[in-house]
Amino acid sequence: MALTIPRSQYVATYGPTVGDKVRLGDTDLWATIEQDFLTKGDECKFGGGKSVRDGMAQSSTATRDNPNVLDFALTNVMIIDAKLGIIKADIGIRDGRIVGIGQAGNPDTMDNVTPNMIIGASTEVHNGAHLIATAGGIDTHIHWICPQQAQHAIENGITTMIGGGSGPADGTHATTCTPGKFNIERMFQACEALPVNIGFFGKGNCSMLEPLKEQVVAGALGLKIHEDWGATPAVIDAALKVADEMDVQVAIHTDTLNESGFLEDTMKAINGRVIHTFHTEGAGGGHAPDIIKAAMYPNVLPASTNPNRPFTVNTIDEHLDMLMVCHHLDKRVPEDVAFADSRIRPETIAAEDILHDMGVFSIMSSDSQAMGRVGEVVTRTWQTADKMKAQRGALGDEGNDNFRIKRYIAKYTINPAIAHGISQYVGSLEVGKLADIVLWKPQFFGVKPEFVMKKGFISFAKMGDPNASIPTPQPVFYRPMFGANAKANTESAVYFVSQASVDANIKAQYGIQKETLAVKGCRDVGKKDLVHNNATPEITVDTERYEVRVDGEHITCEPATKVPLAQRYFLF
């Protein structure tokens, strides 16, 4: 006999279902659940008097020898994912990977249990009702200046960090390159204790091929070209030749001063080959004043860095000071001041907001400690989305913001994964991928996760006083959990590397414990493959007034005077 309960009671017990709207933090973004995979009346819920008990939603007979038995079941959770959409489901995890999105439980007593999502005595369970699950974020613009960045990143929901450097040397302060085998090997060894997936860029600034190839063989997952090392056409061509041969990506910070050519010369050197452009607006560096035009090309995978996301009344002043420090400039030298002024343009920064909202800019990243904040990638993304809704209105959805939400979450999850050949491993909550999962209370979405899982094991979490009688008493702050400790840490995170380095067995050479996974398909992608962010309109820039036009229409917006996800959530 069926029991009918009020919708409010159902939501209070099992969380929202199809048609229910959930506000994201204190933004004006509202997510509506599009599909619910759960069978009403057979929901799995753990606790006193609840259903996940022996012989009820937990099988009495299934052992872990049965490959359909889960290690971890995250039940009744709302999922926001660029590929899966905005849905309600149980998430099943086994051997560190997502094995099912559907209905978990006991097939002996329940209908419609997804075949490989059996809850048994071997299964840990967490109630996901009233929580939002997202894929772990991916930051592709890391200056490895200090190892402490990893903790700040994971506390904002970033689980994969790609970049370069070797500590607080001048070369690392300015560029995201780990140059040469010695430095690459030491960085792999140094990062064994960090709780995130990691990939390193080799230094791509060399006009000859062999010095580039040896870095890829040493473990670089890609090459980074930076103007401070000389972003010349010869360097660009050489790096791309090696990338095409060895199936790795090239990232580029182009020539702000136009010393060796203009944007057109750089695009000619790229010659239609795929490339990932960093801070494509130009405040972080790049051909002044029109690097933003690179975003219109089908072979360019354009990214932003977060310090000018979104455009606010404080953006310009802050950037001038940051730039002087990061690129070793002197306010007493007129040429250095002119260099800084050429990069910081309110007109193109304003246009960048709109290009993100149009799906022209595809990726969000940090530029950590080098004109960017490693712990704010997720937050700045949603602040930009909220600002654009306020200034541009809805993006076609009726009564919700689902399309805009999926467009923006793709910018720091699936799209950077596609750009760097790791989308078969991370970037979404699709079945088969690593169980790198971030859980949020809706009111803290985009700011402070409840906890972060790495390969199906809890790595970081908000945690109260360890000496208290329950987990919640203050002071509550982020602490490393068992997944970030000792050998569990090396089992819960991976290194992304080139196939050539896997073939060379760098894991044994360097004596590292983390799994090494090869990047794949880096040279076969284009902007058309980027999810919800693949627009290629014609972009022009007035070189005197810096006005940006898209298909002939001038685009601009006002700087924000207030943003969400800000002081309401932080003491400082």
From Swiss-Prot:
Protein name per the record: Urease subunit alpha
Domain of life of the source: Bacteria
Main location: cytoplasm
Source organism of this protein record: Actinobacillus pleuropneumoniae
One annotated GO molecular function: urease activity
Maturation and modification: Carboxylation allows a single lysine to coordinate two nickel ions.
N6-carboxylysine carried by residues: 224
Urease domain sequence ranges: 136-572
EC number: 3.5.1.5
GO terms classed as biological process: urea catabolic process
GO cellular component, one term: cytoplasm
EC category: hydrolase
